[in-house]
Amino acid sequence: MFNNDKVKIGICPIGWTNDDMPDLGKENTFEQAVSEMALAGFKGTEIGNKYPKDVKVLKRALEMRNLQIASAWFSSFLTTKPYEETEKEFIAHRDFLHAMGSKVIVVSEQGHSIQGQMETPIFDGKHHFNEEEWNLLAHGLNKLGQLAADKEMRIVYHHHMGTGVQTTEEIDKLMSVTDENLVYLLFDTGHLVYSGENPVEILKKYVQRIKHVHLKDIRPEIVSKVKNEKLSFLKGVRAGAFTVPGDGSIDFEPIFKILAENNYEGWLMIEAEQDPSIANPLEYAIKGRQYIKEKASI
């Protein structure tokens, strides 16, 4: 199966507190979140809004718990704002992650995104990039990829519901118009299945460019409700569309098998945003970690 020296298991803080909807988990502190991550058996995390902004403070808090920073989300606006604005913010983001020892930077284009809009139907209101926007995106991502490479890091592009890169066709387009040596892919099981894509086929096609993995499961009955009732992405999260691996409908065994057979190296991150007042974060973290141990032997 996996080379246990090359693959690390982490969990994102969004199960404890939601940066897009701060009322979800507002009672959960940074210290509680990272302590429970360590208690549940994880080795890493991504950065949330409640995390200390000082490198020394953050490092000390994580070292006490034997945790590392795997990465952190970066919103680019390459299709809607001057490139220089994104670059300036990216460099600061890159340098912080570099200081924390991270090797990958999660990037998602938020120009024209509806993922943060509370009333826009996620299945009906999505923007589709025109050729000019694709060119702006590709050119900008290649530049960001080079800036990451300058620090011996990589950018991994996060396909996401409600954005211009969501579907199989859009992922194919992104991969074809960007430099394969500068722009890599983040593989997110939940967003692919939510969108109606086949995650196994996408994984097979791009496994050599996939350098970061988000493991999330879906509750199909909630996704159907979101579609039928024309709900937004955020309302879907509140309703419980996502959950940890093993608690929904996705079969992760073939996914683990393909990654292992292709000698995947890097992080496998549980990222499962739901209401922590309903889904206790520690309980679900333990549940997800146990599932990975059972199915991936890691």
Swiss-Prot record:
InterPro entries: IolE, IolE/MocC, IolE/XylAMocC-like, Xyl_isomerase-like_sf, Xyl_isomerase-like_TIM-brl. It catalyses: scyllo-inosose = 3D-3,5/4-trihydroxycyclohexane-1,2-dione + H2O. It holds the Pfam family AP_endonuc_2. It comes from the Bacteria. The keyword Magnesium does not apply. Pathway: Polyol metabolism; myo-inositol degradation into acetyl-CoA; acetyl-CoA from myo-inositol: step 2/7. Keywords: Cobalt, Lyase, Manganese. Its EC number is 4.2.1.44. One of its GO terms (biological process) is inositol catabolic process. Its cofactor is glutathione; Co(2+); Mn(2+). Belongs to the IolE/MocC family. PANTHER family: HYDROXYPYRUVATE ISOMERASE, INOSOSE DEHYDRATASE. This is Inosose dehydratase. It comes from Clostridium botulinum (strain Eklund 17B / Type B). The lineage of its organism: Bacteria, Bacillati, Bacillota, Clostridia, Eubacteriales. The gene is iolE.
